[in-house]
């Protein structure tokens, strides 16, 4: 085999970091589902995700930009972004009360297709007929997973779709400010403002957590921050269009984690629908790569 060139080495490192992040992030859902089974309100898990996420990213932000980086440059804009991220996180965590992790994630994967469909309206981007066809195929994949008319559409399916839509709107807002500041700084601002919103929302339903639940709250923040850090580092080594399809490898660990911790396993039709979604997303990524389009480096996982 030919020796590894520096550029090829960077690409392989970026791919490895992205795959590592996708192997780690499903455990965020495992912890959230476990907290729900312990009877804690969903909003408390959302609050922990935001509050501990802000706390754990704080040292990185201080290292990147010092104390000046703690103040958002566009606070109202970041506040709306935080609101969409909270809506996505809340809807997804709530969907885990009704669905296995892999099923909820499969429906949630409609998010990049929604971004593509709405980008002409929100961002004025051009989407050609081939990418529209890929979006339509992805929507068909979502219908295969949900199968309306062939099975009862559970509240969890609706919540997972709402999570995908909310995160799509969050990502569209992220694209508008992409490149203005470091991704970690932007993420910190979103988590900080999100923690403020979540604090107000969780106050009326707050239940005193037990010590083990405080530990799970911290674990939510550690997993989310660790996964995000790996993704940021991956984007430092590879272009976005190469890494974007790798996000779908998260389904592998989500399936394993759901089976191991909760005894859940998706049915065959779910895998068929996920296959259609992945094919659609990979095609869209290839088209964007050929067009020279970059997806935003800022990334969030509900």
Where are these regions (language model features)?
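C-terminal transmembrane-helix exit sites in multi-pass transporters
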Residues: 92-94, 112-133, 205, 252-271
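Helix-helix packing/entry segments at the starts of transmembrane helices
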Residues: 105-110, 177-192, 228-260
């Amino acid at each position: 085999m030919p020796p590894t060139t520096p550029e090829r080495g960077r690409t392989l490192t970026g791919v490895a970091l992205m795959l590592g992040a996708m192997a780690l992030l499903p455990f965020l859902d495992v912890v959230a589902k476990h907290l729900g089974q312990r009877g804690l309100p969903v909003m408390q898990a959302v609050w922990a995700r935001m509050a501990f996420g802000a706390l754990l990213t704080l040292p990185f932000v201080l290292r990147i930009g010092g104390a000046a980086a703690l103040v958002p440059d566009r606070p109202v804009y970041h506040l709306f972004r935080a609101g969409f991220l909270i809506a996505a996180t809340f809807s997804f965590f709530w969907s885990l009360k009704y669905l296995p992790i892999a099923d909820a994630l499969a429906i949630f994967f409609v998010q990049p297709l929604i971004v593509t469909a709405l980008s002409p309206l929100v961002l004025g981007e051009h989407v050609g007929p081939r990418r529209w066809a890929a979006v339509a195929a992805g929507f068909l994949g979502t219908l295969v997973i949900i199968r309306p008319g062939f099975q009862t559409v559970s509240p969890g399916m609706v919540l997972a779709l709402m999570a995908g839509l909310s995160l799509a709107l969050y990502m569209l807002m992220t694209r508008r400010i992409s490149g203005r500041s470091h991704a970690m700084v932007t993420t910190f601002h979103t988590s900080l403002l999100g923690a403020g919103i979540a604090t107000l929302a969780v106050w009326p339903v707050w239940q005193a957590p037990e010590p083990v639940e405080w530990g799970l709250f911290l674990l939510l923040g550690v997993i989310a921050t660790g996964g995000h850090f790996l993704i940021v580092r991956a984007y430092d080594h590879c272009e976005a269009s190469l890494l974007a399809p790798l996000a779908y490898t998260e389904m592998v660990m989500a399936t394993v984690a759901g089976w191991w911790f909760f005894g859940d396993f998706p049915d065959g039709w779910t895998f068929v629908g996920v296959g259609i979604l992945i094919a659609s997303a990979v095609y869209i990524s290839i088209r964007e790569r050929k067009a020279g389009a970059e997806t935003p480096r800022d990334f969030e996982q509900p």
